[in-house]
Amino acid sequence: MKLIVLDRDGVINQDSDAFIKNVDEWIPLPGSIEAIARLCKAGWHVAVATNQSGLARGLFGIQDLSDMHFKMQQLVMDAGGRIDLIVHCPHAQADRCDCRKPLPGMYRTIASHFELEDLRGVPVVGDSHRDLHAGLMVGATPYLVRTGKGLRTLEGPLPPGTQVFDDLAAVVDHLLAGDA
């Protein structure tokens, strides 16, 4: 099975240090929706794993999050693709849960959903160290994009084996070229 795990904010949509709090603030990055659709058309399964501590902070509610995810899924479907699974961590860092990246709880949930022992070799695409480290903990292959917080992330050391691309579309170009 060909599976990819994507972070949301900064990879699929614009990110903000003030959080993405509602459907109007959820704006896709150029080429990201089409990139997901291209993966699907090539037989890939797509999962999204996203920290959403704005829920715990009271910045937005679960309905707001559902509306944002509905918009994302609808745009991907309109482009001819699909998102097979979206998992989110609603906790603040102080909650000390195991689902908040950089811990691998959400990635284990994804592996379980797809009946996989781990995510060995699965591309995990993120814009921050926490995305990459969470993926490494379950054997995934880290891909960093320069969108979102990606340029800031490049200022520090990257996990071994991290591949760096301009954006999600460039990652997909690379993966699909390897499928040929």
For the regions a language model picked out, list residue spans one by one.
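Substrate-recognition element of Asp-dependent hydrolases with the DxDx(T/V) motif
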Residues: 32, 36-69, 83-95, 135
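Conserved hydrophobic residues forming the short capping helix/wall of the S-adenosyl-L-methionine
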Residues: 72-77, 111
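Conserved Lys-Pro-Asp/Glu-containing loop-to-beta segment of HAD-superfamily phosphomonoesterases
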Residues: 100-132
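Acidic, Mg2+-coordinating phosphoryl-transfer loop and its flanking beta/alpha structural elements
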Residues: 124-163
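Active-site neighborhood of HAD-like aspartate-dependent phosphohydrolases
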Residues: 1-47
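Alpha-helix N-cap and loop-to-helix initiation/capping positions
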Residues: 23-28, 60-67, 98-102
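Short acidic-hydrophobic, aromatic-tinged amphipathic segments that line or gate anion-handling sites
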Residues: 163-170
